[in-house]
């Protein structure tokens, strides 16, 4: 009789537990509130504005995407590929249908996606609800620099679904592999991060094939492995399903063009070396320190509570740990793939702690009460200010943005004094998406879509940096792009240079920004 751990299929369920807690203790309720508090974030993501603008235009044009960039005057001939076109349309639909509460609807949508990704990621974990919720809370706390209205979270949700499917493939469910087809078909239209999903699938499949090959040569090793090992038949079915799913990703408005755009962007060394999100992990930032603290904590828990041999999981963790250290933007992916491990290690730590404590203090009710008190204290210390900001961002965004670095006051002045400015704007990189949201009639200089764009010798991001970051600023860039008005951070290097230039006059200034207009010769 075979003793291979892959033979007996397990029931098709969402992990070992239900998708929601069967009972809601005070500790569970407080943990859920803490998670909700973290997942709800105001609309301060720089790229959100252009995603919303693209979605609103998509609705207005009956789902037709523009062939070239319609939003900038600098790169209007660029063949724009919007890899999140369906997400843009969904955001715009929520925003428009809810009227004055549209921004709040978008906030709730991203909170649901964030929490959903985390809950589903922990579903395969061998852990109870308390450990899973604590793990989710810890991961969201570490991920705070990334939280908000970021379309990348659709990819994190896709990864969670993919890992859930893989869990059931491992435990013997052959037909579930065909759900990869609708998953990747939808994913490829929601966000360009579907390529990360294909890569994850390749890592899992490659590691499983390697493990199965080793087991075939040394059958005795099968009993040493602590994760289910798919047999050759299931691996063959999975390979076929993966190929069909990969082919389905061509069913987008762009076909092969989507892959071409992604490959060209990821091959752009200047962009990768310049943008913060593509740079290496650094302890100089709060986010980097939080992440390293998470890794250290995970390592300590593993030393004392992890004794399993799981080569496929190891391969996934090692690969994405390396990617997260190499590129800052990959940290959320590692947080998602490590969530089940985090929950399992916390569960093991709680069991171990209960075993070594004196009998007089082992009462689970007392420990839950103490833990609930700690979570309540954390919620109390955070106060209501955060949720108040979220609500204001969702219901009164113009008022909310007065408290941020975004130039809402200047936008309102421009609307009231449009005749005092020009027709070709220079704006800062971080303001481009915001301006497309709040000044939809204006064409911008640059935004978050454009770091890799180049037409001939015209390299917009490089030209932008020469003007905005170089000392002294390369004012000739303004002439090259025929810019006749500038919206720039007050007292910045560029603002000081324009103050000294006779051909430019300041027409507006507030505590955040200044507006300059080119003077006639």
What are these regions (language model features)?
Residues 59-62, 192-307:
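Transmembrane catalytic cores of multi-pass membrane glycosyltransferases
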Residues 357-416, 430-432, 450, 465-470:
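Membrane-proximal, lumen/periplasm-facing interface regions of secretory-pathway glyco-
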Residues 415-455, 483-490, 516:
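Short periplasmic/luminal acceptor-recognition loop of GT-C membrane glycosyltransferases, typified by
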Residues 168-185, 236-240, 313-318:
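Short hydrophobic alpha-helices at membrane interfaces in multi-pass membrane enzymes
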Residues 162-177, 295-305:
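Membrane-interface transmembrane helices that cradle and orient dolichyl/undecaprenyl
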Residues 35, 139-143, 177-192, 202, ...:
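Membrane-interface alpha helices of multi-pass inner-membrane proteins
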Residues 74-101:
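Short hydrophobic/aromatic helix or loop-helix immediately within or flanking a transmembrane segment
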């Amino acid at each position: 009789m075979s003793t291979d751990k892959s033979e007996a299929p397990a029931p098709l369920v969402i992990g070992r537990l239900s998708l929601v807690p069967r009972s809601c203790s005070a500790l569970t309720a407080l943990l859920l509130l803490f998670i909700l508090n973290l997942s709800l974030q105001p609309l301060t993501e720089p790229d959100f504005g252009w995603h919303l603008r693209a979605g609103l235009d998509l609705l207005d044009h009956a789902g037709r995407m523009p062939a070239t960039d319609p939003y900038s005057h600098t790169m209007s001939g660029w063949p724009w590929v919007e890899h999140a076109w369906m997400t843009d349309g969904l955001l715009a639909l929520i925003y428009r249908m809810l009227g004055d509460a549209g921004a709040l609807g978008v906030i709730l949508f991203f909170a649901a996606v964030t929490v959903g990704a985390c809950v589903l990621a922990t579903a395969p974990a061998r852990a109870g609800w308390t450990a899973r919720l604590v793990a989710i809370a810890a991961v969201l706390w570490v991920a705070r620099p990334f939280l908000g209205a970021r379309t990348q979270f659709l990819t994190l949700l896709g990864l969670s679904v993919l890992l859930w499917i893989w869990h059931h493939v491992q435990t013997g469910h052959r037909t579930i592999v065909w759900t990869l087809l609708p998953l990747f078909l939808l994913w490829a239209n929601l966000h360009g991060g579907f390529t990360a999903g294909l890569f994850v699938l390749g890592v899992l499949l490659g590691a499983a094939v390697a493990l199965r090959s080793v087991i075939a040569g040394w059958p005795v090793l099968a009993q040493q492995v602590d994760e289910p090992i798919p047999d050759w038949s299931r691996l063959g079915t999975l390979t076929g399903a993966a190929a069909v799913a990969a082919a389905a990703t061509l069913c987008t408005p762009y076909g092969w063009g989507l892959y071409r755009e992604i490959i060209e962007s990821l091959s752009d060394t200047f962009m990768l070396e310049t943008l913060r999100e593509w740079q290496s992990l650094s302890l100089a930032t709060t986010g980097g320190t939080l992440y390293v603290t998470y890794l250290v904590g995970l390592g300590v828990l593993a030393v004392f509570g992890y004794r399993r041999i799981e080569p496929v999981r190891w391969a996934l963790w090692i690969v994405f740990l390396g990617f997260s250290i190499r590129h800052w933007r990959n940290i959320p992916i590692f947080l998602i793939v490590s969530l089940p491990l985090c929950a399992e290690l916390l569960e093991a730590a709680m069991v171990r702690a209960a075993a070594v404590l004196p009998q007089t203090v082992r009462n689970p009710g007392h420990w839950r009460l103490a833990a609930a008190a700690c979570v309540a204290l954390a919620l109390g210390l955070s106060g209501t200010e955060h949720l108040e900001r979220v609500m204001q961002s969702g219901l009164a965004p113009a008022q909310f943005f007065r408290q941020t670095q975004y130039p809402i006051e200047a936008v309102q002045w421009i609307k009231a004094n449009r005749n005092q400015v020009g027709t070709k704007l220079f704006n800062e990189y971080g303001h481009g998406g915001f301006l497309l949201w709040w000044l939809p009639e204006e064409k911008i200089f640059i935004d978050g879509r454009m770091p890799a764009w180049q037409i001939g010798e015209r390299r917009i991001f490089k030209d932008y940096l020469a003007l905005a970051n170089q000392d002294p600023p390369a004012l000739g860039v303004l002439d090259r792009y025929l810019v006749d008005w500038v919206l720039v951070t007050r007292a910045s290097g560029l603002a000081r240079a324009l103050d000294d230039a006779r051909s430019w006059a300041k027409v507006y200034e507030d505590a955040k920004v200044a507006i300059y207009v080119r003077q006639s010769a």
